[in-house]
Amino acid sequence: MYANAQPLSPLRFIERSAEVFPQREAIVYGDQSWTYQAFERDVRRFATALLPHLPPLSVSGDDAAASGDAAGQGYLGAEQLTRSLPTVAVIAPNLPAMLMAHYAVPAAGAVLVPLNPRLSTRELDYILEHSEARVVIADSSVLDSVAAAIEGKDGITLVQLPDEQAGIEPVREHSHGEKIPTFDEFIDVEPREAGRAASSGERGVSYGVTDENSPITLNYTSGTTGRPKGVLYGHRGAYLNSLGEVFHNGFDGATRYLWTLPMFHCNGWCTTWAVTAAGGTHVCLRAVRPDAIWDAFDNQGITHLCGAPAVCSIIVDADEAHALDNPIRITTAGAPPAPSIIERLESAGFGIVHVYGLTEVFGPITICEPQEEWKELSPQDRAQQMSRQGVGMVQAESARIVDTEMNDVPKDGEALGEVVLRGNNVMIGYYKDPEATEQAFFGGWFHTGDLGVMHPNGYIQLRDRAKDIIISGGENISSIEVEQALYSHPDVIDVAVIGVAHEKWGERPVAHVVRSAGSSVTGEELREHVRERLSGFKVPDTVTFSDELPRTATGKVRKNLLRG
């Protein structure tokens, strides 16, 4: 350690907030609450309970030095990708225990694997095998599926997480007749004091690290087109990305953040650590239900939330919806909300910010920074500006749009290229897949596979995923562009456009649409609506209506299912 160089880790945030704001409310879940002092105490109990179930530490100063040697390959931490890591999987919704795991697991010297409780047994089997999880903590509602996934795997400690608030009782025995301890039973230990950093061969509870580029979490991609990839995040990236979230969201001690975004998705965009850094309050929410969201708005003084555009629709379409007494900031990612949704949210008192990112970059890495002059625009024109993915966040480098030779495309809003990214919040790499990592980091930049344009003001705008571009008669059709044209119709609340094989043109666009309640708009009317806005060859050949679109837990449309 040096006086002027301290390894960075977001674990420091809970230590600091517990010291500075011991009696401030840190977590609320139903009728339960934790002060920062109690939050930190339970984190240490959790970490202490994990210690006997983890292997001896293998990280040494030599490993820390080796992570720097990989810089010649265009990225740090190459050696982390192939060695076995001590991992702890937590399969749960947005409960206090999932939040605590973001501190307790790395404080015990392990790597957190946060997982979606809606994953199938087959998916869990693959991820738990790939990650080599030593401890698995699972919501009691999915215990049978989890127990089936770990069957035949040796050396795994299984812990269940009942939820009294939701009426989910503990399962006393699983199918093999074994008693599974509850989370409260598991952490019922005398907490160890937290040291600064454990030395080689010793395992203890520590809020410090010797190597800031060592892994803190292992997040799995949604795997919509194949096996999910394991994305390794480092302590340094998590620390800096968290502070970027604090800055861009304006988090402070008065922040009351509602957990509508899954914590298992990119560690909740690092908000698991960011709100704690600011000394704000985490308001946990088990399920994204309109009544629960509006109850939190009315009774918990919510100031911020994040989520997919689908969450925005849930909020404004709720029976409980009404004008807010105090403004609430919504940060949304993915496809921008429809102009009609933006107008309804703003009129109710919500402020909306659009961000862009991927699992590989800790969640958001660019932000569509609002400009003062946009306030004078019509809702339609303002929505058009807000639909852009914007500029790099403060903790990241500027995003680039490049051609196949890695040259920047013209800033004309027309020239199409790939979005490439660089910065402190880019992953260490894909766990156990150095070849895919090398490909992703070609030329010293992370290649997103997203296609976009660069506007004259430096704001990027996505046109499509490379695999979702529809090539019709040799012309590129952006599915996003067609979706946005359909979204501009007031009766369209959700839409996905895909390419289908065509004997003459190669591919043609087809639209899958969810209409607003009571709407009788026809497919031909929607096709005419698109024709008024886009070139004729971009108009979908057919429009199919359904009650809902298949989505991942993080709100992405599963276009692979629509393609069949």
PLM features: residue spans?
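Conserved AMP-binding A3 loop
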Residues: T35-A38, I216-L240
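Conserved pre-ATP/AMP-binding loop-to-beta segment of ANL
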Residues: P22-Q23, Q160, K179-Y220, R227, ...
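Adenylate-forming
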Residues: P93, A138-A147, L261, V288-D291, ...
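Conserved AMP-binding/adenylate-forming
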Residues: Q32, A49-L119, G280, D298, I330, P337-V353, N476, ...
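Structural core segment of the AMP-binding/adenylate-forming
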Residues: P52, A65-Q73, A107-V189, A194-A198, ...
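Conserved AMP-binding/adenylation subdomain of ANL enzymes
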Residues: Y239-R256, F264-H304, A318-D319
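AMP-binding/adenylate-forming catalytic core of the ANL superfamily
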Residues: L119, V136-A138, L305, G423, ...
